[in-house]
């Protein structure tokens, strides 16, 4: 095995990404780390950053020779007085491992200076899916969109899981789109919190983004592939409704909602969502990790295998026709128990969805019935920093 390169050592290739070190980190890479100035080969595009976190910033760049667009992720090697180069090496190794998977962002090359490492990544022009999650209803994802994108997310996650990689920070900000209009394909990004988890080993860490962490994280139980599946359940809920299911007014309340499974599948939140989609979410938002559906099982769920979904507009039209029939005293066909909507939790009525982050992304989707209940509890869609602050998380890629 060739030892990892340090700055100034020539930039020859390092070893294959097969070695696993302490704490579930990969320790070996095969990418040649380049030490010449990044600006010799790339020019940074003017305009706003693609993303920023405590220890990293992502900028759009242009390769001078080819004119191709990339995303450059500048990552500080020292964080809070600690050398975190090996965490960056791990992220590179995971990207190498997934280089042939179409649903994981592609790593182009790596540069290193005395203070930072620069990952040159595939540029996803469509941005984060969080933009659609918080959009007004006419601009948000429809269920068919979510079906297609969730199938891609699951195929990517299934690939990672078969290679013992658990992402541990799956959320709308870490799922990018190749294009916004027409709606493109997904790219899973940001493996800063990812870990290697093997069946014979136990890994316990407090990490993740509050709204998306699984109950076992909060109880300090072992992390597993099922930890990602919980996050996918939350992600699906958000993509379909624009509502963050467990969000409280603070982190403590959010964690309490997660640990006590305080969430709603009411008619108000899922008024345009199929019963099959709700069942899909319920297979994932299960407290015991061993009872959650795996990525492979999810890909076989009827919601993702059926050929079509009833048009949400048609479903709303039918509901209005039924309501009109009731007002006129006409009979309405009885709905079988197999197609009934989940019961409403009257204690929680969602009033609004507000984005809280370092900048405002604009008004989010609002419930159609928000004015009917003065004591409604707001659910806010926050872009939180991951719990493990030593590793970057609140940025694109």
Curated annotation (Swiss-Prot):
The keyword ATP-binding applies. It is found in: Nucleus. Its EC number is 2.7.11.1. The modification Phosphoserine is found at residue 9. Keywords: Apoptosis, ATP-binding, Kinase, Nucleotide-binding, Nucleus, Phosphoprotein, Serine/threonine-protein kinase, Transferase. The active site is at 169 (proton acceptor). Coiled coil: none annotated. Residues 1-23 are annotated as: Disordered. It comes from the Eukaryota. ATP binds at residues 50-58, 73. One of its GO terms (molecular function) is protein serine kinase activity. Pfam families: Pkinase. Highly expressed in bone marrow. Lower levels in brain, heart, lung, liver and kidney. Residues 44-304 form the Protein kinase domain. InterPro entries: DRAK1_STKc, Kinase-like_dom_sf, Prot_kinase_dom, Protein_kinase_ATP_BS, Ser/Thr_kinase_AS. This is Serine/threonine-protein kinase 17A.
């Amino acid at each position: 095995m060739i030892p990892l390169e340090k700055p100034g050592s020539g930039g020859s290739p390092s070893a294959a990404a097969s070695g696993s070190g302490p704490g579930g980190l990969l320790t070996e890479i095969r990418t040649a780390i380049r030490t010449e100035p990044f600006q010799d080969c790339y020019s940074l595009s003017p305009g706003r950053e693609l993303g920023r976190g405590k220890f990293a910033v992502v900028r759009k760049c242009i390769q001078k020779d080819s004119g191709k667009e990339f995303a450059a992720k500048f990552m500080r090697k020292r964080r809070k007085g600690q050398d975190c180069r090996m965490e960056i090496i791990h992220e590179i190794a995971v990207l190498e491992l997934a280089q042939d998977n179409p649903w994981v962002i592609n790593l182009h090359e790596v540069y290193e200076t005395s203070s930072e490492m620069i990952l040159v990544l595939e540029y996803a022009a469509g941005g984060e899916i969080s933009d659609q999650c918080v959009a007004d209803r006419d601009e948000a994802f429809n269920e068919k969109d979510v079906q297609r994108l969730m199938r891609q997310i699951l195929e990517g996650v299934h690939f990672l899981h078969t290679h013992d990689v658990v992402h541990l920070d799956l959320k709308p900000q870490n799922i990018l789109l190749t294009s916004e209009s027409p709606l493109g394909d997904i790219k899973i990004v940001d493996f800063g919190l990812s870990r290697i988890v093997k069946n014979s080993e136990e890994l316990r860490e407090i990490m993740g983004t509050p709204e998306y962490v699984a109950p076992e994280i909060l109880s300090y139980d072992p992390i597993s592939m099922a930890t990602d599946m919980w996050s996918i359940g939350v992600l699906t809920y958000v993509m379909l409704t624009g509502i963050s299911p467990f969000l409280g007014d603070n982190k403590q309340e959010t964690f309490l909602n997660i640990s006590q499974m305080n969430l709603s599948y009411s008619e108000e939140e899922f008024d345009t969502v199929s019963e099959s989609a709700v069942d899909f979410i319920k297979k994932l938002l299960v407290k015991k990790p061993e009872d959650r559906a795996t990525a492979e099982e999810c890909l076989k769920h009827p919601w993702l295998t059926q050929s079509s979904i009833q048009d949400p507009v048609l479903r709303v039209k039918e509901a209005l026709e039924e309501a009109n029939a009731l007002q006129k005293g006409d009979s309405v066909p009885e709905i079988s128990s197999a197609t009934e909507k989940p019961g409403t939790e009257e204690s929680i009525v969602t009033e609004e969805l507000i984005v809280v982050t370092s900048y405002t992304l604009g008004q989010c989707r609002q419930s159609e019935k928000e004015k009917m209940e003065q004591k409604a509890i707001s659910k806010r869609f926050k872009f939180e920093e991951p719990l493990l602050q030593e590793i970057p998380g609140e940025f694109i890629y």
